[in-house]
Amino acid sequence: MTAIINENVKISECEEMIMKIIWDEDGDPDLDTVTDKVAIRFGRRWKKQTVATFMTRLMKKGWIDIYKLGRYSHYHPLITIEQYRKDKMMEFFDLYPHMEKNQIFQVVTELMTELVG
């Protein structure tokens, strides 16, 4: 089941970084994995408690589910990267409804490159 992004529930830039890490994982990552990968990929050296706070916010916003496996919490995305990308593109088109097709294609190409990574 694909969750629909609630237009009133936006995520911050930091939460978006964390979501990108979660989406890129093969399974549902734990706190240590997310903390380490945010530091490597984005250069953010956050403490585990900071990342855990962002995770709790993402859960409250309906973006992820948190579950325990043994003594570790794991994070499962409730919104797919595809749905997120679609939502971001629709936001853009809402801002610029009168763009020509070639302009739209150029912008979409740039957005996709940025969102991938």
Predicted regions and their residues:
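A short, conserved structural fragment
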Residues: 59-69
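Short helix-coil junctions and helix-kink-helix linkers
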Residues: 36-46
